[in-house]
């Protein structure tokens, strides 16, 4: 089996795990239907198949008296889905809608992209 076929099969396998749909929003100026330039949120991508994954880390050390738990949130999407850092990502997964913010560049693979997310707390 050649690499291209292997990547195609691996991508199909990964995409079978996608349980969510994402809408991606960006903040900036845009011209509305009346030709007026306005600042605000615009829809950049709609109904993107995805999966949100959560990973927790216990950061307790011997000198600390209390446990501290950190959580990494990752978004898995197709390799052709490019999301700018700072974009708002609205995800519907497992009947729950949550708004996140893309925090940086994606880890890009031939089969998918992984974006680190954090909870969205409004536009900066």
Model-identified regions with their sequence ranges:
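N-terminal helix-cap/turn-to-beta initiation motif at the start of protein domains
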Residues: 13-17
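Short, conserved turn/kink motifs that form compact alpha/beta structural patches or helix kinks used as
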Residues: 1-6, 21, 26-124
């Amino acid at each position: 089996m050649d690499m291209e076929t292997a990547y195609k099969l691996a991508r199909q396998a990964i995409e079978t795990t996608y349980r969510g749909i994402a809408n991606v929003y960006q903040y900036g100026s845009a011209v509305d239907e009346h030709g007026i330039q306005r600042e605000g949120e615009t829809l950049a991508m709609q109904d993107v198949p995805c999966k949100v994954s959560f990973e927790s880390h216990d950061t307790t050390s011997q000198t600390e008296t209390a446990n501290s738990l950190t959580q990494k949130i990752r978004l898995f999407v197709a390799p052709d889905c490019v999301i700018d850092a700072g974009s708002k990502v609205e995800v519907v997964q497992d009947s729950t809608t949550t708004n996140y913010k893309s925090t940086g560049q994606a880890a890009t693979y031939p089969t998918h992209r992984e974006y680190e997310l954090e909870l969205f707390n409004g536009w900066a």
